[in-house]
Amino acid sequence: LIQDGHVDGKNIHIFEGMKILGGSNDGAGSIKDGFVCRGGRMLNEETYENFWELFDRIPSLDHPGQSVTKEILDFDHLHPTEARARLIDRHGKILDVKSMGFDNNDRLTLGKLMITPESKLDDITIEQWFKDAPHFFTTNFWYMWQTTFAFQKWSSVFELKRYMNRMIFEFPRIETLAGVTRTPYNQFESVILPIKKYLDSHHVNFVTNATVTDIDFKDDDTITVKALYLNKDGKDEKIILNDNDICIMTNACMTDSATLGDYKTPAPKPVEKPISGELWYKVAQKKPNLGNPEPFFGNIKETNWESITVTFKGNKFLKIIEEFSTNIPGSGALMTFKDS
């Protein structure tokens, strides 16, 4: 908007329901209290063209005169990823994963998926697609692809196809994750903070702890927004949009319903409904062709997942992992205990 659309930054307003910016990239904390990273993005040099083009325009916070893109790629090239303990069995043995483990039926079923139009894949799970090829779920490929991109058997085969198309470069190197592009720090500090500072310098208005609770549309066949309903710090507010205003909505977030536990207490079941999901339900009822949030928010057991961020005061654990995997810290990407 600022660079290509020449929009004055002071006319851009970003409403965030949380107290911190970054969405799923909100890794934050302190040495004293520990860190929490609710999510992370697996970057890839070959296929994230829009990301690299954008951040090639954003200055690095640590290296004056250098872009965030160059900072990340330089760091990654100096610290390449090469997992040496990608899959581990129930006996603690590192498995040989040079072979994908496919049989011919697996190959045919996967190949058929790649050439099937997306219009024929609605409401089909991965398990349903491979119902006549159950061996697929015992292959090294499934265990590695599943844990790299957070798939389950009940996930959408539509999404699996899209990941296969988009991440096809990772197919021949999935056993080492050599294609994973690492950021120097966690992605909140390496990605969110630089772009936040850049937008601040252009006087973009960030409003945190502000939940958009509903949207009014024009009474025609467009999806033109005429009003936003906001709850800011517990107070309701209505914002009227002008005819030439642009409204961009985030209709869902993977970490929207996240709750936190601690060393002694499990994360509790969410009490509040997901803010982006609730908004999506409302707008989908008002206008056609805005998607269906039910599969994403109506199947709690299937869409629930747990993530643990560990903050150590020493390096003993890192040394144990390094000795076991032969990877120095940061170079091994993922270790999957396939029978856990």
Tell where the protein language model's regions lie, with residue ranges.
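Glycine-rich FAD pyrophosphate-binding loop
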Residues: 2-30
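Conserved FAD-binding subdomain of flavin-dependent enzymes
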Residues: 32-74
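Rossmann-like flavin
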Residues: 61-166
